[in-house]
């Protein structure tokens, strides 16, 4: 009787360990899920000010990333990561805009890439634009919604 009871307790304990492990994994996925769209946005649209704006070339940028290879046009923004991180913050750093659109008050440098008719490369246009961002349900920027050109940038 005691051997059976100990065996049942051991198997019950194994089940609880498995259930708790799965719950921990699920919680981690939910907590870090927000970073996926943010990281993907940054990877696809962000140009770091650590390099000069005119050093960025569409032909290189569009071929560097697998996700952009088949796109006929794309928009890149030249701004600090810190500034993008603060776009969805509503006053207090804990309070974030969620599932809403936010126009940035200052114009940003924007690089637009358009595939040429012969598909051999990309034409680029550079300008200062007001940018409307979408703040996702996680309270972080996940897309560029709209652009309003203020002034073209000539080489």
Residue ranges and their predicted role:
Residues 94, 108-123:
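A domain-level detector for eukaryotic transcription factor DNA-interaction modules
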Residues 88, 113, 135:
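Short cysteine clusters
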Residues 116-155:
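Compact beta-sheet-dominated globular domain cores
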Residues 2-110:
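N-terminal "domain-start" segment
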């Amino acid at each position: 009787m005691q051997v059976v009871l100990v065996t049942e307790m051991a198997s019950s304990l194994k089940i609880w360990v498995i259930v708790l492990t799965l719950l921990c994994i699920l919680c981690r996925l939910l907590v870090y899920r927000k970073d996926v769209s943010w990281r993907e946005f940054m990877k696809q649209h962000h140009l770091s000010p650590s390099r000069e704006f005119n050093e960025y070339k569409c032909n290189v940028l569009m071929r560097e990333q697998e996700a952009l290879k088949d796109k006929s046009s794309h928009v890149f923004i030249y701004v600090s990561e810190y500034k993008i991180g603060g776009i969805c913050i509503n006053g207090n750093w804990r309070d974030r805009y969620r599932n809403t659109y936010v126009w940035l008050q200052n114009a940003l440098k924007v690089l637009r890439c358009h595939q040429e008719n012969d598909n051999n490369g990309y034409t680029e246009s550079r300008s200062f634009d007001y940018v409307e961002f979408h703040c996702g349900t996680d309270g972080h920027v996940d897309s560029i919604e709209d652009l309003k050109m203020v002034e073209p940038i000539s080489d």
